[in-house]
Amino acid sequence: MSAEGYKYRALYPYKKEREEDIDLRVGDTLSVSRATLLALGCFAEGMEARPEQIGWLNGCNENTGQRGDFPGTYVEYLGRKRISPPTPKPRPPRPLPVAPGAARGEAEAQAFTLPDLAEQFSPPDIGPPVLIKLIEAIEKKGLESATLYRSQSSSSLTELRQILECDAASVDFEQFDIAILSDALKRYFLDLPHPVIPALMYSEMLSAARESISSDEYVQLLRKIIRCANVPQQYWLTLQYLLKHFFQLCQSSSKNLLSAKSLAEIFSPLLFRIQVSSSDSSEFSTQILEVLIASEWNEKQAAPALPPKPSKSTAVTNNGTNHVMSLQDAEWYWGDISREEVNEKLRDTTDGTFLVRDASTIMHGDYTLTLRKGGNNKLIKIFHRDGKYGFSDPLTFNSVVELITHYRNESLAQYNPKLDVKLLYPVSRFQQDQVVKEDSIDAVGKKLREYNVQFEEKNQEYDRLYEDYTRTSQEIQMKRTAIEAFNETIKIFEEQCQTQEKYSKEYIEKFRREGNEKEIQRLLHNYEKLKSRISEIVDSKRRLEEDLKKQTAENREIDKRMNSIKPDLIQLRKTRDQYLMWLTQKGVRQKKLNEWMGNENTEDQYSVVEEEDLPHQDERTWNVGNINRNQAENLLRGKRDGTFLVRESSKAGCFACSVMAEGEVKHCVINKTHTGFGFAEPYNLYSSLKELVLHYQYTSLVQHNDSLNVTLAHPVYAQQRR
């Protein structure tokens, strides 16, 4: 049986680069079936005559009998032909080689590159302006298109690049059809000077892919690599924005037929842009991207429904005051605390227990609701845009408080059918568990000493592990770089070996005819020496790879050990601080607390002064009123560590403490809440600024900030007023 096909002639010679390619010689005749072109998803009537626009074609070289892929830029169209149809198979996108006879303008176009991602935008922007505009237009016009990213527009390379070079703010991208937009998006990634996922990231991802770990651990490891790799954060921000776009596409997969796998096949060559030596490497890059897309989908697919628009009455509860309560006053709002601390607070709680914290993303105004459901913690992002809040578009709530109040009365099933639970039990930062069981001050003091010793020991162990982890991570990276250098060296030596082998036969035959045995032996000796050197390098590389594998496993064990210690460290610190707070509230002097804590302030000129005689008692020595950060730094510069002042903060209703620590001026916010002044919850319990200053005259600020291991020892104006 025959089918319709097309006939082409090779204009340039081509040497196959991959297993699936075929060789071309000038004048070779090639045939391609119509079914094969249709399977590409980018074929339109009449395009068979323009093979350079189709890209890579799959057909048969009638001169050699080979069947496989060849570049459309290397052939010309001859006409129609009846041929036996092959079985078409889909292929991921592949960049075309430049034809040897291409015009100068085309060659210059190939050399075109966009600015580096780090030059295109800076945080808090979430992505490059052109990329954002392109994706917004694609999602608005072609989210449900069945040919999205699989059809090709008739626009030339120059036209696509004109789109990418334009000012994103002044151009309406919706004027272009969806095929042009999708082509421009793919061209954007090809024209970047460096791939979105650089080789540094890819090598670490490849190592992770070959490890025998669970899928959840693999996803976490990939995300850690993306964030921790030594590349500008604009790269992972761009990747993060693109993954969100893929998530939107997957939501409409029933119409656009795009799955995580198909998207990975299309975009992995564009995002990785690696020169693969085997099909396995190509499969790995596709699998890595598929895992990232699927993890984005799994995290967010539990939120398909939109929240209903709340009625005005839902914001007001029985007491009639919640609708005006600020977020800072809400008992369930914990501010900037870590995920580990959240997990600790929600451990073993009942379904419906919840709290809200600042989101870990860089977007200002976003928050994360953590809810207990089914014995697990569910993380739900609270978005903020144009003064409105919500879990997903459209954002309809006027505040986070209004949003939480609504779902305390209504089930979250309105938002997500899988979350059939109300926000029933807030984890209150005002009502912490009473862990102090002893009833005498001396007994509590002894317990404080015990917990402090345990905390310091555990903290030292964590610090040692962190140093080991940092050291091994650096060594691992150095060894990976060395292995890459070995590969390049081996390649060079093998090329030399092939060259010498090629020409040695001719020279040996020549010298044999001349009877020059000495030159023959010299050639053979050099060849054997070269082979021996290659063997030595290969052995060195193999030993280094074995060492790298062992050290990678060691590094992973250190990381696991650090993660296992962290919850204990948080719990010990929490317990110690609650004992310390209990003693402080009982009126125990700081000198006695320091004895129990093992703190010594031998350099403090006020350590033997009674509290009522301290210069801190005179607010004029440290309260400088309304000055800015620069003025505060000028006042403190050159002073000894522990010299401090308190000023009005740029944050309304709050104050700021500026203090010398390790030779630098550091700044921290002093909160003012209904419970009192303080640096952080649950320490906002001082009735006045003076009371707070007197307390931290003896107590280090390190419990609030690891870089502030200092007390408020010396008021900035103290010596002038003594």
Curated annotation (Swiss-Prot):
Q: How is this protein annotated for GO cellular component?
A: cytoplasm; nucleus; phosphatidylinositol 3-kinase complex, class IA
User: What name does the UniProt record give this protein?
Assistant: Phosphatidylinositol 3-kinase regulatory subunit alpha
Which residue range or ranges hold the Rho-GAP domain? 112-300
Subunit relationships: Heterodimer of a p110 (catalytic) and a p85 (regulatory) subunits.
Which lineage do the record's taxonomy fields give for this organism? Eukaryota, Metazoa, Chordata, Craniata, Vertebrata
Q: Which gene does this sequence derive from?
A: pik3r1-a
Instruction: Site Arginine finger: list residues.
Output: 150
Task: Identify its protein family.
Answer: Belongs to the PI3K p85 subunit family.
Q: Which Pfam families match?
A: PI3K_P85_iSH2, RhoGAP, SH2
What are the UniProt keywords, alphabetically? GTPase activation, Phosphoprotein, Repeat, SH2 domain, SH3 domain
Q: Which residues form the SH3 domain?
A: 3-80
Q: What does this protein do?
A: Binds to activated (phosphorylated) protein-Tyr kinases, through its SH2 domain, and acts as an adapter, mediating the association of the p110 catalytic unit to the plasma membrane.
A biological process term (GO) from this entry = negative regulation of apoptotic process
Molecular functions (GO terms): 1-phosphatidylinositol-3-kinase regulator activity; ErbB-3 class receptor binding; insulin receptor binding; insulin receptor substrate binding; insulin-like growth factor receptor binding; phosphatidylinositol 3-kinase regulator activity
